[in-house]
Amino acid sequence: MTQVTVKELAQVVDTPVERLLLQMRDAGLPHTSAEQVVTDSEKQALLTHLKGSHGDRASEPRKITLQRKTTTTLKVGGSKTVSVEVRKKKTYVKRSPDEIEAERQRELEEQRAAEEAERLKAEEAAARQRAEEEARKAEEAARAKAAEEAVSAQPAAAVEVAAAEPVAKPAAAEERKKEEPRRVPKRDEDDERRDRKHTQHRPSVKEKEKAPAPRVAPRSTDEESDGYRRGGRGGKSKLKKRNQHGFQNPTGPIVREVNIGETITVAELAAQMSVKGAEVVKFMFKMGSPVTINQVLDQETAQLVAEELGHKVKLVSENALEEQLAESLKFEGEAVTRAPVVTVMGHVDHGKTSLLDYIRRAKVAAGEAGGITQHIGAYHVETERGMVTFLDTPGHAAFTAMRARGAQATDIVILVVAADDGVMPQTQEAVQHAKAAGVPIVVAVNKIDKPEANPDNIKNGLAALDVIPEEWGGDAPFVPVSAKLGTGVDELLEAVLLQAEVLELKATPSAPGRGVVVESRLDKGRGPVATVLVQDGTLRQGDMVLVGINYGRVRAMLDENGKPIKEAGPSIPVEILGLDGTPDAGDEMTVVADEKKAREVALFRQGKFREVKLARAHAGKLENIFENMGQEEKKTLNIVLKADVRGSLEALQGSLSGLGNDEVQVRVVGGGVGGITESDANLALASNAVLFGFNVRADAGARKIVEAEGLDMRYYNVIYDIIEDVKKALTGMLGSDLRENILGIAEVRDVFRSPKFGAIAGCMVTEGMVHRNRPIRVLRDDVVIFEGELESLRRFKDDVAEVRAGMECGIGVKSYNDVKVGDKIEVFEKVEVARSL
């Protein structure tokens, strides 16, 4: 690279050398003569200085402002949108060199002030330490002087005793030295240490080799904290500080306590065990459960995994909210006698509803579809002996869960048994539900007016179920009644109220309402409607209620006759409006203080219900994954089911899901309470399902989709019909089997030759009937040697269609000439036979 001097640079830029040197000096460059060399970096520095001095720097902007504008759109309601414009403004300021220099000077001054303050502080500390040292020395001198005076003042006898015991005195002095170490001046300790150093025995090389390695005393924590260690000559040298965050491998497995709730994800479980999530996933794969890290595990699975990995498991309840709610619902008040809740149970068509109709002076049974009860009905009746609340349950086999709920919510069970029919399956089931709930049973032997009635047969049948009549020494009253004529109804009510007196039923009317959901439905005009039986306290219009995973304010209350009421006390059934959804039958209803608490608990229950449901569903899939491997896929009948009430929906789902076998199954892809809507029709279209409406109808939008897409939609009002139709559909999906029927057997007696057909077998029909143009088998020694078709059948040179047993005929077999005497010709037909479930 060519070197440029100041003189050459002045010629290039066309300026005098003196002026260029002056400018270079202003730029801070060290050049003083024209012969000095100018480097590229010095040229750049000179150029920057000249630009700044000629106004380029002043023309640069000192302040830059950046503006940013973003526009977003928010959706409000259905189709309305709102545009939101956000404007942001930022200003960047470029400081001048003077300001930067002033800032630097200020920082230097602050640093100097801090150093000065630190120095003054150190001087004060040193002065304070010197003062303390002088005070300590003065105190030690005073103590030594006092000790000398005390010794000189001792009597002569003490001096003689001290002289007589020269050995004991040094010992006492030593003890005094040990007790008062601070009295000895520091220089005396140094002298003693120096004397010991000179007088102690120094070991030889051999002794050093034989001697064990000396133990290293632990370093002083004070010295280590200062970062120094004591040197060989009493000085201090720098000590490398140890890493405070060092890690040591554990010598044994660490057992941790793992808290597991009702559900837990794989990642949370791994975090509690302090292992990687991948390790838990790998371990569960080895156990035969393929999972992902975010998968929810149920409590049992998580407990098994944690225990297998060697950790302690603590099962915790996540019901803090529920416990707070239960605590807030505690109420102390005066308890009064309440009316009994009586559930009428029994087999289908044994007259339960008819008996209730006579008691209520109503006609419910006449208006029921198919003459059978398909919902739980709740009524309260005022009698001469007091009020009684009745629950009427269905007797059909499909309504098992409904009957179980009726038994749980009741005080007394009236078991209706038809005198002309006897103990039936649902009668036995009702007895089991009542015994499981611990409820007393009153047996009503109905239809006693019929000539074929046999009450003794009823007693024998129920005694076998451990329901012993009172006259036999048991505790179950048997009352013969006739729902048609009203015979024995008063005696039945008297027996019920007598049982209620024995039970001593109590309730607190002043407490907040608490009860159970008997039934729920979705009304098109009023929304979700729940039939609630108040069990304790008083339910009032306007109360905030929590029902299972639903909540809401009671907007209106209706009694069983549809009349509006303002409040309902214990043992009163009411319909409430205002919930945010249709609760499940059997859910507990409680009155809470405010909407916030109700929403909080309801959302907690919804999340918990969803997690448990997902965990169980996935566990079921994992259990069946290997069982289903290698098997053909089942044929599935998809159904979208809508019902009028929640109880009927549950009963139908349970009954339909139980249909099917190893080849066909029913899958309810969607179900709900209320009419068939457009979304139901679209779901049926997407899943290739059949739409079933039980006591409900489709709206106009749904009907339009059904007609346009050709969907199959059916209405029902009797549970028998829907179950029978689904059974027929499943039977059709099974297809048919081909079965062979042997029509006849002919024995070959002789063989003839025909120019047209070849070998003709002269046969005697021994069994059945031989038909022409039917499939045949040729058997030789009872072994099939040919299978074909019977082409020609003649009798006395005449073609015939069939030949009966005991007659001779000639048989020509198509494409077969190896017929021999003694063969048997078996004629059969293939028939399609429909399969059944």
From Swiss-Prot:
Residues 94-253 are annotated as: Disordered. Pfam families: EF-G_D2 (PF22042), GTP_EFTU (PF00009), IF-2 (PF11987), IF2_assoc (PF08364), IF2_N (PF04760). GTP binds at residues 346-353, 392-396, 446-449. It comes from the Bacteria. Residues 95-148, 172-188, 220-229 have a biased composition (Basic and acidic residues). Residues 346-353 are annotated as: G1. Keywords: Cytoplasm, GTP-binding, Initiation factor, Nucleotide-binding, Protein biosynthesis. Residues 149-171 have a biased composition (Low complexity). InterPro entries: DNA-bd_dom_put_sf (IPR009061), EF-G-like_DII (IPR053905), IF2_assoc_dom_bac (IPR013575), IF2_II (IPR044145), IF2_N (IPR006847), P-loop_NTPase (IPR027417), Small_GTP-bd (IPR005225), T_Tr_GTP-bd_dom (IPR000795). Residues 482-484 are annotated as: G5. Belongs to the TRAFAC class translation factor GTPase superfamily. Classic translation factor GTPase family. IF-2 subfamily. NCBIfam families: IF-2, small_GTP. This is Translation initiation factor IF-2. It comes from Pseudomonas paraeruginosa (strain DSM 24068 / PA7). The lineage of its organism: Bacteria, Pseudomonadati, Pseudomonadota, Gammaproteobacteria, Pseudomonadales.
